[in-house]
């Protein structure tokens, strides 16, 4: 694509032409925002669904095989060390994808559940047989509508598609029946708050 070739001005022009024809095209809106420096609160649901439905079959080979992706193992090690021994209890994987962190953390859980926007990713996660329950849902939708009774909420490279995280924090704090903990990874920015990058992903500052 023009974006992948680094032809950003041409890419913006092409996406704006698409928006002139279909103004409500969420994916095009998101990409134009990312390329023009406009920070929105989150990536549109349809954009994320389409991105990962299309990426699902080559996701693990791309990340684990080609990029030696280690975040799930690192995050699991952090949680287990912080917990200080024994089982973690009930864990909810927010944006479980193909189940990479589920495979790492399963043996430390009494109950492991996962949610994701991509049906294709969920199929691959289900095939691993590490989750006690999987749900096709948006994070805010799930946290708002479901009963929450978890010891840990984990999220691996998912908040890079959610800029404004205050609703996530608020819902977990207000609705969870236990004194649960949230452990997650983000991409870093030196700017205040959060920023939508040209990649279409969000970065967050440490202070945020």
Language model features with spans:
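A conserved beta-strand element that flanks and buttresses the S-adenosyl-L-methionine
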Residues: 154
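A short glycine-rich, Lys/Arg-flanked "PGG" loop and its adjoining helix->strand segment in the class I
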Residues: 166-179
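Acceptor-substrate binding/catalytic loop of class I
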Residues: 193-208
């Amino acid at each position: 694509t023009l974006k992948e070739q680094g032809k950003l001005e041409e890419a913006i022009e092409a996406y704006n032409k698409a928006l002139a024809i279909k103004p409500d095209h969420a994916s095009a809106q998101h990409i134009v925002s990312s390329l023009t420096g406009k920070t929105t609160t989150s990536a549109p649901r349809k954009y994320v669904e389409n991105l990962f439905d299309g990426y699902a079959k080559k996701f693990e080979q791309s990340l684990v095989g080609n990029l030696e992706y280690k975040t799930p193992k690192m995050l699991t090690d952090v949680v287990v060390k912080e917990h200080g021994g024994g089982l973690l209890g009930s864990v909810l994987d927010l944006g479980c994808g193909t189940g990479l962190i589920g495979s790492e953390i399963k043996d430390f859980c009494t109950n492991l559940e996962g949610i994701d926007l991509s049906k294709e990713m969920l199929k691959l996660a289900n095939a691993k047989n590490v989750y006690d329950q999987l749900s096709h849902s948006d994070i805010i939708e799930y946290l708002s509508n479901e009963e929450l009774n978890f010891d840990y909420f984990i999220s691996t490279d998912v908040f890079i598609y959610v800029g404004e995280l205050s609703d996530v924090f608020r819902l977990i704090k207000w609705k969870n029946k236990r004194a649960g903990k949230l452990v997650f990874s983000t991409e870093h920015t030196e700017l205040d708050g959060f920023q939508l990058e040209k990649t279409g992903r969000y970065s967050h500052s440490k202070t945020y």
